[in-house]
A protein has these predicted regions:
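Active-site histidine-anchored catalytic micro-motif
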Residues: 89
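Conserved "HGTGT" condensation-loop signature of ketosynthase/thiolase-family condensing enzymes
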Residues: 1-82, 95, 99-100, 110-217, ...
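Short helix-initiation/N-cap motifs at beta->coil->alpha
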Residues: 84-86
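Short, well-structured beta-strand segments enriched in hydrophobic/aromatic residues
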Residues: 105-109
Length: 225
């Protein structure tokens, strides 16, 4: 499989919106802005796009973005479940589509109002529309309401099996912050931290402290392959 897709696709455009605590606009507006910025960055037109891929968690249907921007018929579209690592899955799906001739130009996008919109632990009401919602009943009643609390359980098990210590968690958090500190568009631009500051932060869910967690941020990003 690696031989089939190697050197068959490349990132040709990147687009972002501003990142904030309150975007003041809809997630569709954010997604459309990021996709259009990526199209412009690539020197393309909306009509050049014939494939789209995003997260299953994204609230913006491909057809709505296509309508908003003037993108024509799509030869390929897909969605990758879950959060976090799904971003790499989008690139993989887009690369496979291009390598197999399913599409020529694919945009990968994600938009989120992560603070002013729906927030984790705010509860779920109404009828269950899909089986996906059933699993919440296994941990929500016990206080596991956020991604940090879920990942903390995996982290505890991982540390137990491997002997890994907090040193490794610090390195991950520190490397991630370094990326942000060197990005002028990041809320953490120019703000680094050392081990002492990391250790001084409150525990969110043992073994995870504040700096191990992401912010509730609003914005959108898109890349074009």
């Amino acid at each position: 499989m690696n031989e089939i897709i190697t050197n068959k696709a490349a990132v040709v455009g990147v687009g972002n919106t501003a990142f904030s605590k309150n975007s003041g606009v809809s997630e569709l507006s954010l997604a459309s802005e990021a996709v259009l910025n990526a199209i412009n960055d690539a020197g393309l037109k909306p009509s050049d796009i014939d494939g789209m891929t995003t997260f299953t968690m994204d609230n913006n249907d491909e057809i709505e973005i296509a309508r908003a921007l003037g993108i024509g018929d799509l030869n390929f579209y897909s969605r990758i479940p879950h959060g976090g690592g799904a971003a790499t899955g989008l690139l993989h799906q887009a690369t496979m589509a291009i390598a197999t001739g399913m599409a020529e130009t694919v945009v990968c996008y994600r938009a989120l109002n992560g603070r002013s919109g729906h927030r984790y632990s705010s509860g779920v009401s109404g009828n269950l529309l899909t089986a996906d919602a059933i699993h919440w009943g296994w941990y929500m009643p016990y206080g596991l309401l956020t991604p940090a609390s879920w990942v903390a359980m995996f982290t505890q098990r991982w540390m137990h099996l491997t002997g890994i210590t907090k040193d490794a968690l610090f390195e991950v958090a520190h490397a991630t912050r370094d990326y942000a500190a060197n990005n002028p568009a990041s809320p953490f631009y120019g703000q680094t931290f050392d081990r002492a500051e990391y250790d001084a932060q409150k525990v969110i869910a043992d073994q995870l402290q504040l700096y191990d967690c992401c912010q509730e941020t609003e914005g959108a990003s898109a890349v074009i392959l």
